[in-house]
Swiss-Prot record:
It comes from Escherichia coli O157:H7. Induction: Up-regulated by the nitrogen regulatory protein C (NtrC also called GlnG) and repressed by RutR. PANTHER family: ALKANESULFONATE MONOOXYGENASE (PTHR42847), ALKANESULFONATE MONOOXYGENASE-RELATED (PTHR42847:SF4). This is Pyrimidine monooxygenase RutA. The FMN-N(5)-oxide reacts spontaneously with NADH to produce FMN. Requires the flavin reductase RutF to regenerate FMN in vivo. Belongs to the NtaA/SnaA/DszA monooxygenase family. RutA subfamily. Its EC number is 1.14.99.46. GO terms for biological process: alkanesulfonate catabolic process; nitrogen utilization; uracil catabolic process.
Length: 382
């Protein structure tokens, strides 16, 4: 029997605030976000991601984001050993969509800021002003050592100093088309970028450490954070509160967008059975590699994203918050997410992206009070 899912009751003022944004974290790497031999096994392709993002756009998702990963975890599943590149993928997706916001991720150790500024301006032109950039400092040392560009372990403690200079160059070039910035990491000499973006370029980040949140508070339009636990949709609230407090120090409005995996079915029991099946097939070899890498950063503190990713509690999906249940239960839990102060959106992954987005759009989203402003849609006819 399907479990009942009581609906939250909001005032009109609450409802105006709780029109939560929904995004999809596209599977740019093989197998998405489940490190399990029991999960769907697939390679990343443009055609797959095109189908995912077009389906997300049909169901009124607000944005799509791709990460960047330059070396995987190995193991039986060869987890994330096969990856597309973020900017070129999102440029292609920008050309085959019309409404959804598109974000690519810049691994800032690999790309000079002037090149990122020009690539972003190009995708702004392709998308008609729907593009933004996610900036990451880089934590997985082997990704950069393999190319001979790891700057040394000192970088762990200086990475946000580096990123601060990086974003200042971007701001110069996007804002005025010119930069003469001089810093410890970058020296611009009458550097030029034209054309400039047609609209102000959104910059996002995923800082969870104090330094990361301070950076986001100063420079980001919003900040990603991990959800926490299984069916504990508001457990991230202290993280959102920290981000809100950091933003208050800069006088800016920087909301939190929370990462969750959705595993849904007709009933709570059926969804739970899928989740347990995935956990039973955990790729222990790949997970061991993740744990080993997470221990190499001894300088950034204990509150970083990678520390949470490697926690053995739910490492099978990198410890992102997981919502497991019937369609009604997942809708209720997402409404709870929207009730947390500072939470302005969620970034969703699915065990099966194509069917997951479809069932989300048709069976979950129509039950969500924080998405009640949207029409109810059925599957798009090809």
């Amino acid at each position: 029997m399907q479990n009942a899912a009581p609906r939250l009751t909001f005032t009109l003022r609450d409802e105006e605030r709780l029109m939560m944004k929904i995004g999809v974290f596209v599977p740019i790497g093989n197998n998405g976000w489940l490190i399990s031999t029991h999960a769907p096994q697939y390679m990343p392709t443009f055609e797959l991601n095109k189908a995912i993002v077009q389906k997300a756009e049909h169901y009124h998702f607000d944005f799509a984001l791709s990460m960047i990963k330059l070396r995987g975890f190995g193991g039986k599943t060869e987890f994330w050993d096969h990856n597309l590149e973020s900017f070129t993928l999102m440029a292609g997706l920008a050309a085959v969509t019309s409404r959804i916001q598109i974000y690519a991720t810049a691994a800032t150790l690999t790309l000079p800021p002037a090149i990122v500024a020009r690539m972003a301006a190009t995708i702004d032109s392709i998308s008609g002003g729907r593009f933004g950039v996610n900036l990451v400092t880089g934590w997985q040392k082997p990704e950069y050592e393999q190319m001979g560009i790891w700057p040394g372990d000192d970088y762990f403690s200086r990475r946000y100093d580096y990123l601060t200079e990086y974003v200042q160059v971007l701001r110069d070039l996007w804002g005025t088309g010119k930069s003469d910035f001089k810093g410890d990491f970058f020296t611009m000499n009458d550097c030029r970028v034209s054309p400039q973006p047609s609209v102000p370029m959104k910059v996002i980040c995923a800082g969870q450490s104090d330094a990361g949140m301070a950076f986001s508070a100063q420079y980001a339009d919003f900040n990603f954070c991990f959800g926490k636990g299984v069916n504990t949709p508001t457990a991230f609230a202290p993280t959102a509160a920290r981000m809100k407090q950091a933003a208050e120090q800069t006088g800016r409005d920087v909301g939190s967008y929370v990462l969750f995996m959705v595993i849904a079915d007709e009933t709570d029991d059926a969804a739970r059975a899928k989740w347990e099946h995935y956990k039973a097939g955990a790729d222990e070899e790949a997970l061991s590699w993740l744990t080993e890498q997470s221990q190499k950063d001894t300088r950034s503190g204990t509150d970083t994203n990678v520390r949470q990713m490697a926690d053995p509690t739910s490492a099978v999906n990198i410890n992102m918050g997981t919502l497991v249940g019937s369609y009604a239960s997942v809708a209720r839990m997402l409404d709870e997410v929207a009730s947390v102060p500072g939470a302005e959106g969620v970034l969703l992954t699915f065990d099966d992206f194509l069917s997951g987005i479809e069932t989300f759009g048709e069976r979950i989203q129509p039950l969500m009070q924080c998405r009640a402003h949207l029409p109810v849609l059925t599957q798009e006819v090809a």
